[in-house]
């Protein structure tokens, strides 16, 4: 496949988009902040004057807001813990709940076999990073919680997978939310609770420890939830000789917590600048479509709705490049395998080889890796679309994922330019190729 190299990404311009989007605060799908982000993205795409831009209304997604969350050990000692509600979770009764603490391991069926989950608060270990041995269920992106819910647990606790006083919130809710109160705590507090369960040195001297003495917690979570619609923003550069065939660049604009600078204002910003650069170039043979999607943090809801909206014409999408987490991290990666809806999925080896060829041709380095959970590549792969996923910050030691500390100061402007150049040249290579595209 012949590659003709173009540039046109200005690092400061991409970074400015990141700052504008991050300044909105948390952009939960269907929230007012997300609607402001959608308006910003739409305005920037329309301002090119050379792209056809429209909004695609999604099916309902949970509209969620945290009002308050508290967690306290009440037995065998009293200890207040810092926490925050997990995205999409439900509320406890107004006075909270007091329940025994149960350790559910990694949340696998075998971890629950000897446990009495009824009237309990369950604590789980965090998912493993960059492995394929986690488990998740359809509609629940990063944990299969069906048994916990069915057996009458009163609440759920997840803790960060890295040491520090920050809270990393996992993704547990699908597009309809999570019918269970749930909070996330720090790594240290997670270990503290597990030590209490084992009656180690966490119990102060002088307090008698008995083999069957329970650990009891008080949990209070207050949230507001309702179902609402959101929007994907779609901008099209129509092809000349093969306009019905499409090449996609996809990034999600919603986020889980905090400013969401890297996750995922960084990828949205790259998409905007790549779209502007491509709009100024002659039209390619195939159509290039830029798709800014909602609801990735709720189980890829927006990209699933895009695929569903295509119906049978999804076969006209000949290649899809997904961007997520591109603004900070150790290296540039393309994903080879990940988990989606409880199954291992594979990104396109053919498209990954094109990415690799383009990246090396530009003088940059990119490496393959597996990833514990899919991003918006999942729905496209499931639909049979050759798909690649580019990211940076997937190091096991990257601490800012789904955290308040994901701010613009962690963004590497030059990294955004590199990803933008890779995307421009990959899209144009694919859109101007007359070769049969493989999977």
Regions found by a protein language model. Give the residues of each.
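Acidic, glycine-rich active-site loops and adjacent beta-strand->loop/helix elements
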Residues: 127-129, 161-163, 223, 253-256, ...
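Soluble metallo-hydrolase cores and metallopeptidase-like ectodomains found primarily
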Residues: 82-83, 87-114, 172-260, 276, ...
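Metal-dependent peptidase/peptidase-like ectodomains
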Residues: 190, 283, 293-395, 435-438
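Active-site alpha-helical elements of protease catalytic centers
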Residues: 261-274
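Noncatalytic luminal/extracellular "stalk/propeptide" segments of secretory-pathway proteins
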Residues: 7, 11, 16-121, 127-133
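Second-shell loop/turn segments in exported
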Residues: 1-8, 23-32, 42, 92, ...
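N-terminal capping segment at the start of a domain
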Residues: 1-32, 56-58, 166-172, 182, ...
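His/Asp/Glu-rich mid-to-C-terminal helical/loop segments that flank catalytic regions of hydrolases
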Residues: 280, 288, 397-439
